[in-house]
């Protein structure tokens, strides 16, 4: 049986595909390549298309014996979602509705969903627990929460089995340097800092240094992308054993401040990396850390690469060899 990975050419998706292949899984990838990269994929059956394409989904489910879907395909920028909410509901919610409808038509009833800790909104406690209130503060988080609720009701009505994985910031790259992180425009802190080290940016901005944290900068939960890949695989195995459906946080066990991330990047790269203090961004909480006790207990998941230094080292190794990301590879493959 095969696993269909939607959005499998994206950052977390491509690392999950690589991890699945290393476990001996047969993998089918569907991606529209708006954000993903063909150069991040090898040795898989690839479909270039959209999750809202009914006919394409029929073809995929008819052609391949698929027992589980891992669903990454989504628009995922918080700021953009505030400016373009219709697009986010269209792609994320309606897209998932189309995917789910076709899954059920073809009797595929297991799905692992890449959700987000943005479903919680402003945290009521740190670390965040799955039982905490889910009150998203932006359309991106709202769409992910709506999808989670859709899965719940489809379980009640049709026997769908699902795992929703909620996490904050993926970081790092394949430890062997085969694939890495490439967004356009780049919005994630670690690759932005590494672009400064590569001379592609003059400096990095620290948005606020007057938070109630030890060094005044925001604290965030970073998880190595291969640890996230492993979590998605373990979730598939959990569902194949008829494990309970539900939502699971994935956390590193501790958070890292913006200043701490920059300092570790300086140490790893050997570059000074100039930084400047900028005004706070609206809606940025001082600290966001997720508890992963439930995932550890039920899924058997433990981070293999919890060290910030290791995440930065793996990211730096890839960025040094691919300073312009997948641009060359994409031109060759598309």
From Swiss-Prot:
Cofactor: NAD(+)
Keyword Isomerase appears in the UniProt entry: yes
Keywords assigned by UniProt, alphabetized: Carbohydrate metabolism, Galactose metabolism, Isomerase, NAD
Enzyme class, spelled out: isomerase
EC number: 5.1.3.2
Pathway in which this enzyme or protein is active: Carbohydrate metabolism; galactose metabolism
Enzymatic reactions: UDP-alpha-D-glucose = UDP-alpha-D-galactose
Residue positions binding substrate: 116, 140, 169, 188-189, 205-207, 220, 281-284
A molecular function GO annotation: UDP-glucose 4-epimerase activity
CDD domains xrefs: UDP_G4E_1_SDR_e (cd05247)
Active site (catalytic residues): 140 (proton acceptor)
GO biological process: galactose catabolic process via UDP-galactose, Leloir pathway
Binding partners and assembly: Homodimer.
Its biological purpose: Involved in the metabolism of galactose. Catalyzes the conversion of UDP-galactose (UDP-Gal) to UDP-glucose (UDP-Glc) through a mechanism involving the transient reduction of NAD.
Protein family membership: Belongs to the NAD(P)-dependent epimerase/dehydratase family.
Name of protein: UDP-glucose 4-epimerase
Record organism: Halalkalibacterium halodurans (strain ATCC BAA-125 / DSM 18197 / FERM 7344 / JCM 9153 / C-125)
